[in-house]
Amino acid sequence: MKRICIYVTLSLLISTSQAQTFQRTENGIKTTVADPNVNVEIQWFTPGSLRVLKTPQGQTVEKKSLSVIAQPAKTDLRVTSSGDGLITMKSQSLTVTLDTKNGTLTYAKPDGSILLKELKNDRPFTKTNDAGRQTYIVYQGFQTDKEEGLYGLGQLQNGKMMQRNMTKVLAQGNVEDVSPIFQSTKGYGVYWDNYSATTYTDNNQETSFSSVVGDCIDYYFMYGQSADGVIAAV
């Protein structure tokens, strides 16, 4: 009898240690990731749009967007966690999975078709000094398909409609009106909510944003199923 009790107790301890803890909020989830050491918060706005906030562990950032006026809204979600470190959020339009082993997010259609993946981020926050204020260079990379078209970034003077295989510093100038947003022919868009000089990179390894000043990684993912749908979400 003692052996049975010991076995059951050990089984419960193992299953508890394997389950990823997270806080369910009114509009999404909050959790922490050990590698890299970041806090992750996901705020849903609609069944197809959400905000991702990442901050260094041990720091609290209350950031109010200067460009997004919409507020997170209660969304019908099914949230589950698994023993292999995955937290999955499902709405009627979108499935979002956070891998807590490496901090990456994957966005998929309800049928499981992948829309976009984050790349493992080994340098989310690099300490820097901005006019005497300690802050960070913030970076996030994504894995996009080679055959998908990416459009956006504002009104550029590069003679291109498709923004692929390029590196571009997004900073306002006299002849260009830039915006750190791209949309895909897969029917989704990504808006990088940072107002400092930001480098957009697209090559065979990644599609990424890197901003010279930021207290957090802050971006919006919008799945509208089409270009018009993404524009409507924006």
Which sequence ranges carry the predicted segments?
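Short secondary-structure capping/turn segments at boundaries of alpha-helices and beta-strands
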Residues: G28-T31, V38-E41, V178-S179, S208
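A low-complexity, Ser/Thr/Gly/Pro-enriched, surface-exposed linker/loop concept
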Residues: F22, E26, Q43-I87, F125-K127
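A short, compositionally biased micro-patch
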Residues: A34-D35, F45, S82, S184
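Bacterial Sec-dependent N-terminal signal peptides
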Residues: M1-Q23
